[in-house]
Amino acid sequence: MKAVILAGGLGTRLSEETIVKPKPMVEIGGKPILWHIMKMYSVHGIKDFIICCGYKGYVIKEYFANYFLHMSDVTFHMAENRMEVHHKRVEPWNVTLVDTGDSSMTGGRLKRVAEYVKDDEAFLFTYGDGVADLDIKATIDFHKAHGKKATLTATFPPGRFGALDIRAGQVRSFQEKPKGDGAMINGGFFVLNPSVIDLIDNDATTWEQEPLMTLAQQGELMAFEHPGFWQPMDTLRDKVYLEGLWEKGKAPWKTWE
């Protein structure tokens, strides 16, 4: 199964770093948060990734084009015009980088990569700025079992997100503000049937608005409830928090060796 990751946003609340790189390339523990997200999927057997590039997308392309340089020790034999890579660290990934426009909204970016998932039974979809100790395989199994078009991961918020109205596992509506403590939110990790892309009109469509709301109204949106760790990296404070967890060896999303 393929995983589509949005990686084209500006990241204005992390402007100290995103002035020179896209938000998914902001580092946690010396590696881009995009890498952390891909490792989260990879540990569950996901090897095919489609990255929706936009703002400063060339930075992402350069990273993967020179992956050995970023991940390994190297010796440059200058007179021989040769590079020797030591202790190669390679991932079993197939990474497709797609330019989805500098100003496209989240739905527009997904629509632009439709050709890469159109023949699949289902695919995974997430944002390039959040991590969780999520059981990816369990979300896939849940999606296959209920037979609806879309599954989102419902989680508990740090405190500033709109809430979901979930009844018997089905998302009935979105609410601008939580009803109170205990309300779950859209955690941004999806399992989708390709047909949901038909609900996206154009580049200006926001995935979290019309498409998701329509799926909820049609009874085609189910919630996989994740009570564990979940944390987006929206602000510098979020980055510092995640960096601290990583440095202390207490990063809950690190389920790989």
From Swiss-Prot:
Its EC number is 2.7.7.33. GO terms for molecular function: glucose-1-phosphate cytidylyltransferase activity; metal ion binding; nucleotide binding. Pathway: Nucleotide-sugar biosynthesis; CDP-3,6-dideoxy-D-mannose biosynthesis; CDP-3,6-dideoxy-D-mannose from CTP and alpha-D-glucose 1-phosphate: step 1/5; Bacterial outer membrane biogenesis; LPS O-antigen biosynthesis. Its cofactor is Mg(2+). One of its GO terms (biological process) is O antigen biosynthetic process. Gene3D superfamilies: Spore Coat Polysaccharide Biosynthesis Protein SpsA, Chain A (3.90.550.10). Catalysis proceeds via a sequential rather than a ping-pong bi-bi reaction mechanism. Belongs to the glucose-1-phosphate cytidylyltransferase family. Homohexamer. This is Glucose-1-phosphate cytidylyltransferase. It comes from Salmonella typhimurium (strain LT2 / SGSC1412 / ATCC 700720). The lineage of its organism: Bacteria, Pseudomonadati, Pseudomonadota, Gammaproteobacteria, Enterobacterales. The gene is rfbF.
